[in-house]
């Protein structure tokens, strides 16, 4: 039985943000929807687009919050409460400044590292930080004052290509995660570099 019951892809809603670095988490859930042939549907009570799928014989729920990033925990908290999903059964996919494009890593727990989507998710899960994170590397602009503009802009074609390769590998690892467990998926993904 899979340890993960809910996979969340963080991003900002609307066409304006669709191709920006901050939406890397959403990109992966959309990729999984295409790969495993499920449709995400708007569900107002969960403040997001949701789906239920059976992958590798395991039932899992997917969520893309339709709130802005800094309020995305509202969606995670609402769905987790409704379906009685514990923080330890949640995987949140998000963009990661501290990893280069072409790298993605899974970890459990930790702080929010300044990421407002993680910050709100932690707050909405009663300050429980013990959920899993799948961090999609987007690189860092080099100066903390440039971070906000950087995450809300599109990656260069070279960076996007590297990010896409990491997303493809991460999508393959999600199937491993659901069939064979998080340790096996983590070992494979954390050793990958595009």
Curated annotation (Swiss-Prot):
Subcellular location: Cytoplasm
InterPro entries named in the record: Pept_tRNA_hydro (IPR001328), Pept_tRNA_hydro_CS (IPR018171), Pept_tRNA_hydro_sf (IPR036416)
Keyword RNA-binding found: yes
Reaction equations catalysed: an N-acyl-L-alpha-aminoacyl-tRNA + H2O = an N-acyl-L-amino acid + a tRNA + H(+)
Entry annotation: catalytic residues: 22 (proton acceptor)
Primary enzyme class: hydrolase
Pfam family, one: Pept_tRNA_hydro
Site, as annotated: Discriminates between blocked and unblocked aminoacyl-tRNA: 12
Keywords for the protein's UniProt record, in alphabetical order: Cytoplasm, Hydrolase, RNA-binding, tRNA-binding
Listed GO CC annotations: cytoplasm
GO BP terms: protein quality control for misfolded or incompletely synthesized proteins; rescue of stalled ribosome
Keyword Transmembrane: no
E.C. designation(s): 3.1.1.29
Binding residues annotated for tRNA, in chain numbering: 17, 68, 70, 116
Residue numbers marked as site, Stabilizes the basic form of H active site to accept a proton: 95
Single GO molecular function: peptidyl-tRNA hydrolase activity
Quaternary state and interactors: Monomer.
Similarity comment: Belongs to the PTH family.
Function per UniProt: Hydrolyzes ribosome-free peptidyl-tRNAs (with 1 or more amino acids incorporated), which drop off the ribosome during protein synthesis, or as a result of ribosome stalling.
Identification of the protein by name: Peptidyl-tRNA hydrolase
Organism: Mannheimia succiniciproducens (strain KCTC 0769BP / MBEL55E)
């Amino acid at each position: 039985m899979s340890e993960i019951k809910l996979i969340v892809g963080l991003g900002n809603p609307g066409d304006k943000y669709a191709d920006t670095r901050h939406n890397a988490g959403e990109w992966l859930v959309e990729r999984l929807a295409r790969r495993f042939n499920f449709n995400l549907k708007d569900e107002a009570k969960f403040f997001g687009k949701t789906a239920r799928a059976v992958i590798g014989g395991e039932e899992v729920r997917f969520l893309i919050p339709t709130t802005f990033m800094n309020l995305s925990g509202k969606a995670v908290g609402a769905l987790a409460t409704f379906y009685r999903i514990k923080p330890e059964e949640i995987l949140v996919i998000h963009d990661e400044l501290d990893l280069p494009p072409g790298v993605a890593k899974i970890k459990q727990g930790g702080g929010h590292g300044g990421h407002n989507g993680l910050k709100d998710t932690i707050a909405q899960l009663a300050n429980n930080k013990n959920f899993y994170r799948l961090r999609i590397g987007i690189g860092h602009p080099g100066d903390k004052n440039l971070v906000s503009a950087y995450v809300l802009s599109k990656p260069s074609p070279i960076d996007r290509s590297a990010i896409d390769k990491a997303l493809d590998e991460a999508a393959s690892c999600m199937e491993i995660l659901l069939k064979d467990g998080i340790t096996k998926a983590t070992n494979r993904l954390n050793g990958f570099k595009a």
